[in-house]
Amino acid sequence: MADLSLDELIRKRGTAAKGRLSVRPGIGGVRSRVGIQHSLVNQPARTATFQQRFDARQKIGLSDARLKLGVKDAREKLLQKDARFRIKGKVQDAREMLNSRKQQGTVPQKPRQVADAREKISLKRRSPAAFTSPPIGTVTPALKLTKTIQVPQQKAMVPLHAHPAGMRINVVNNHQAKQNLYDLDEDDDIVVPVPPKQMKFAATGSLVHHMTGLSSSKLSMSKALPLTKVVQNDAYTAPVLPSSVRTKALTSMSRTLVNKEEPPKELPPAEPVLSPLEGTKMTVNNLHPRVTEEDIVELFCVCGALKRARLVHPGVAEVVFVKKDDAITAYKKYNNRCLDGQPMKCNLHMNGNVITSDQPILLRLSDSPSVKKESELPRRGNPASSNPPAEVDPDTVLRALFKSSGASVTTQPTEFKIKL
């Protein structure tokens, strides 16, 4: 193609456009028909160049609307929303759930740095606001005991150290959110001879009153601080207060029911009365031999806090939940659910009853309050005692059944008339 000026190119394209507008014969004059013939003669070369430059297929291929919008095939959507996959996902084997949870839990977590309380106290002492003379007895933070039932006094763990002249006692204010340590002055130190070996020290008697007086006068507090019993770390034992309260309640209950005073020796054993500290136990049977204790812990810790979980022997596991509701949810979730291809048979031990895997309806019956069962326990234990059972009066039975007394029955005989 020879070099053409811009004017000639515009002129040629204009004549080609005029020829396209007047395609129909018989319309227009001689010029239009001559223009058509002239354009038809020169048409093949132009159409070739037009197809090379402006091919409609190339434009459609480059700017396809489906490619821009990212439209997916309908079959892929159907596969994603298929109900069969949803059903399979809900009833999947528990082993698949464990494996997926392990893959998610492989992200490394930064270990928490647990600082010792003694280091914190030493940092406080080094600050300029602290006292110049370091105190001899140090106080650790008050422990949060989760396994006690409303103990009136809270235990504080204080290690005691020997001192030739005396010892310094720190008072812990448990009523404030942040524990403040108050040191008494050296003039008011209580001199107690302490041997070089550590010993148990209990603040009782006049020492308690003296300590409350010192705390109210020196620390100028509106209310006397509760003094706690100071024991050694290794010698700490849980209080036995709740069991005694429970036995007292049972004795009073049995006396009101029987109207007879019974010695506490004849009470039924306290084993069926389950305290909330014991937790709710659930046994899992029909397990695959390759199921380990870690699998049991990982499987049931999702439902709630576990008190303990162990594998009794291959095929049988025992799980104890802290809360009763968590045990019920775990029973509903995992009962008759497959683990490694075998359905788990869960037995729930609640309030002395055992709900097996074939009796899920007993969950509703066992949700009744346990106070009724506690009141029924002495009633069951009374016939087993040495007292003979009370004699039943037949008149009372007749009154209850027929709403009439025995005397009326004897005085008024029944007449029968028989017709033959």
Curated annotation (Swiss-Prot):
<dbReference type="Pfam" id="PF00076">
    <property type="entry name" value="RRM_1"/>
</dbReference>
<feature type="domain" description="RRM">
    <location>
        <begin position="280"/>
        <end position="351"/>
    </location>
</feature>
<feature type="compositionally biased region" description="Basic and acidic residues">
    <location>
        <begin position="370"/>
        <end position="379"/>
    </location>
</feature>
<protein>
    <recommendedName>
        <fullName>Polymerase delta-interacting protein 3</fullName>
    </recommendedName>
</protein>
<keyword id="KW-0509">mRNA transport</keyword>
<dbReference type="InterPro" id="IPR000504">
    <property type="entry name" value="RRM_dom"/>
</dbReference>
<feature type="modified residue" description="N-acetylalanine">
    <location>
        <position position="2"/>
    </location>
</feature>
<feature type="modified residue" description="Phosphoserine">
    <location>
        <position position="385"/>
    </location>
</feature>
<feature type="region of interest" description="Disordered">
    <location>
        <begin position="256"/>
        <end position="277"/>
    </location>
</feature>
<keyword id="KW-1017">Isopeptide bond</keyword>
<dbReference type="GO" id="GO:0003723">
    <property type="term" value="F:RNA binding"/>
</dbReference>
<feature type="modified residue" description="Phosphoserine">
    <location>
        <position position="244"/>
    </location>
</feature>
<dbReference type="InterPro" id="IPR051229">
    <property type="entry name" value="ALYREF_mRNA_export"/>
</dbReference>
<feature type="modified residue" description="Omega-N-methylarginine">
    <location>
        <position position="33"/>
    </location>
</feature>
<dbReference type="GO" id="GO:0044877">
    <property type="term" value="F:protein-containing complex binding"/>
</dbReference>
<keyword id="KW-0832">Ubl conjugation</keyword>
<dbReference type="GO" id="GO:0016607">
    <property type="term" value="C:nuclear speck"/>
</dbReference>
<feature type="modified residue" description="Phosphoserine">
    <location>
        <position position="127"/>
    </location>
</feature>
<feature type="modified residue" description="Phosphoserine">
    <location>
        <position position="215"/>
    </location>
</feature>
<keyword id="KW-0488">Methylation</keyword>
<keyword id="KW-0694">RNA-binding</keyword>
<dbReference type="InterPro" id="IPR012677">
    <property type="entry name" value="Nucleotide-bd_a/b_plait_sf"/>
</dbReference>
<comment type="subunit">
    <text>Interacts with POLD2. Interacts with NCBP1 and EIF4A3. Associates with the multiprotein exon junction complex (EJC). Interacts with RPS6KB1 (activated). Interacts with ERH. Interacts with THOC2, DDX39B and ZC3H11A; the interactions are ATP-dependent and indicative for an association with the TREX complex.</text>
</comment>
<keyword id="KW-0539">Nucleus</keyword>
<feature type="modified residue" description="Phosphoserine">
    <location>
        <position position="5"/>
    </location>
</feature>
<dbReference type="GO" id="GO:0045727">
    <property type="term" value="P:positive regulation of translation"/>
</dbReference>
<feature type="cross-link" description="Glycyl lysine isopeptide (Lys-Gly) (interchain with G-Cter in SUMO2)">
    <location>
        <position position="417"/>
    </location>
</feature>
<feature type="modified residue" description="Phosphoserine">
    <location>
        <position position="275"/>
    </location>
</feature>
<keyword id="KW-0810">Translation regulation</keyword>
<keyword id="KW-0007">Acetylation</keyword>
<keyword id="KW-0813">Transport</keyword>
<feature type="cross-link" description="Glycyl lysine isopeptide (Lys-Gly) (interchain with G-Cter in SUMO2)">
    <location>
        <position position="372"/>
    </location>
</feature>
<dbReference type="GO" id="GO:0036464">
    <property type="term" value="C:cytoplasmic ribonucleoprotein granule"/>
</dbReference>
<feature type="cross-link" description="Glycyl lysine isopeptide (Lys-Gly) (interchain with G-Cter in SUMO2)">
    <location>
        <position position="200"/>
    </location>
</feature>
<feature type="cross-link" description="Glycyl lysine isopeptide (Lys-Gly) (interchain with G-Cter in SUMO2)">
    <location>
        <position position="223"/>
    </location>
</feature>
<keyword id="KW-0597">Phosphoprotein</keyword>
<comment type="function">
    <text>Is involved in regulation of translation. Is preferentially associated with CBC-bound spliced mRNA-protein complexes during the pioneer round of mRNA translation. Contributes to enhanced translational efficiency of spliced over nonspliced mRNAs. Recruits activated ribosomal protein S6 kinase beta-1 I/RPS6KB1 to newly synthesized mRNA. Involved in nuclear mRNA export; probably mediated by association with the TREX complex.</text>
</comment>
<feature type="cross-link" description="Glycyl lysine isopeptide (Lys-Gly) (interchain with G-Cter in SUMO2)">
    <location>
        <position position="248"/>
    </location>
</feature>
<feature type="modified residue" description="Phosphoserine">
    <location>
        <position position="217"/>
    </location>
</feature>
<dbReference type="InterPro" id="IPR035979">
    <property type="entry name" value="RBD_domain_sf"/>
</dbReference>
<dbReference type="GO" id="GO:0016973">
    <property type="term" value="P:poly(A)+ mRNA export from nucleus"/>
</dbReference>
<feature type="modified residue" description="Phosphothreonine">
    <location>
        <position position="140"/>
    </location>
</feature>
